[in-house]
Amino acid sequence: MLSPAPEEPLLLAELKPGRPHQFDWKSSCETWSVAFSPDGSWFAWSQGHCIVKLIPWPLEEQFIPKGFEAKSRSSKNETKGRGSPKEKTLDCGQIVWGLAFSPWPSPPSKKLWARHHPQVPDVSCLILATGLNDGQIKIWEVQTGLLLLNLSGHQDVVRDLSFTPSGSLILVSASRDKTLRIWDLNKHGKQIQVLSGHLQWVYCCSISPDCSMLCSAAGEKSVFLWSMRSYTLIRKLEGHQSSVVSCDFSPDSALLVTASYDTNVIMWDPYTGERLRSLHHTQLNPPMDDSDVHISSLRSVCFSPEGLYLATVADDRLLRIWALELKTPIAFAPMTNGLCCTFFPHGGVIATGTRDGHVQFWTAPRVLSSLKHLCRKALRSFLTTYQVLALPIPKKMKEFLTYRTF
């Protein structure tokens, strides 16, 4: 299943923070995290100096790529029908490291929020969690910009956040205090579990789309897989040679990718722990001397919504696009001081954040998934690797369904 050669990513738009005179813009201005809401209606951006911007999506029409117009205009018209949302500025009081939108919760959750927070208009229950420098987590109502909850427990920077995709309002936080914590926002933000075992800072966390597994990665080269049902450790994944700083599950939960300062992305089978392939980030322009050995250190990795591509950001000033079946990138884009990346939920756009507080939006490959891939994705959404291997089907079909072949 070879993908057609895509065009190089094109820069669609760049957002820059305002520059109030009281801020020293030479420090604490990093965009450590960017996020789209699961329905694609909002974009959040930690622009440094304790500020998060909430921006209705899509942006102005001139920034919308070809093939994206119809869906975007429909979304915009629907939004206008119920009152146009406006850009919001959230002052979090501390440097913001992690961001996560909740999925749209079920109606019972909506009533719970309205009952316990009568000051919040009952118009939307989309919420945003922000992880702060002092270990606090702040929970915001997106439509109004109101602060709903403060979650306390971590003793150091909250580096990453992840909501269960099911809409249950279970939140996982990863911290430099070497722990992960599980919070139930349906119970006033009650802390229901602390996961320990990492020996160094926990950089990232990701919950599988089927809500069965949690991945966490830390500074001791380790990747941990946890059960989201029992909150116990399933296995450790060994293979990286330096700190692991980013992780993401494929849309069907069948694959896990991890990115490290060792310049490699490793693709794993999370059910078996098998290492399927490595994607090495070779510098296009080698350094002038051997002292700069970490110039290709990775910062972020993410899956595309259809599960056919990966995007990575590295210290060598490149955004790379990878096809799963290939070991070399299929496209590059130059970007300076990149820190994070994420795909738009409906595809076609990649957002990246930089050290100077900027956000850039790039075109992403838009391809029609093959029927084979769609069938594999549908099956793997509810079948584990072991269940696939137990099926009475030919070996080649098992290899395809378990991503050993493409």
Swiss-Prot record:
Pathway: Protein modification; protein ubiquitination
WD repeat extents: 107-150, 153-193, 197-236, 239-278, 293-332
Pfam families: SOCS_box (PF07525), WD40 (PF00400)
Alphabetical UniProt keywords: Repeat, Ubl conjugation pathway, WD repeat
CDD domains for the chain: SOCS_WSB_SWIP, WD40
Role: May be a substrate-recognition component of a SCF-like ECS (Elongin-Cullin-SOCS-box protein) E3 ubiquitin ligase complex which mediates the ubiquitination and subsequent proteasomal degradation of target proteins.
Domain notes: The SOCS box domain mediates the interaction with the Elongin BC complex, an adapter module in different E3 ubiquitin ligase complexes.
PANTHER family according to UniProt: WD REPEAT AND SOCS BOX-CONTAINING PROTEIN 2 (PTHR15622:SF1), WD40 REPEAT PROTEIN (PTHR15622)
Protein name, as recorded: WD repeat and SOCS box-containing protein 2
Organism: Bos taurus
Gene name of the encoded protein: WSB2
